[in-house]
């Protein structure tokens, strides 16, 4: 029984460390809110998108409890606008594309699907015109 408790405790510590690491990537993107240079790995981009969705759901719940119509969700998305654009531009740089590719999302349906396809691509190996490969750092 003692051994099971020790293993369980170590497993919980490992899970906590992994959660903190994922949250750290979200915070790192917020710190780089005005950095449109360089590259962003898939993990950095998608962890930011994941936590952004989680916090938007929480903001929506708060809106529902208070009876407001999208006030907190709207404020949250407004606050996340520049960090989201910055990490998206860096994500495009990682696959060797210009940040201007973000405008493809303005093409209904097909543009958003193409952008999704681009964001799930692995970054270019080695250096490219936008900087060093963040995977190697």
Predicted regions and their residues:
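Hydrophobic alpha-helical transmembrane segments in multi-pass membrane proteins
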Residues: 48, 52-56, 60
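Selective recognition of hydrophobic, aromatic-rich stretches within alpha-helical transmembrane segments
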Residues: 23-24, 66-86, 99-121
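Juxtamembrane "helix-exit" motif on the non-cytosolic side of transmembrane helices
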Residues: 61-65
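Membrane-interface extramembranous regions at the lipid-water interface
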Residues: 2-51, 84-100, 117-137
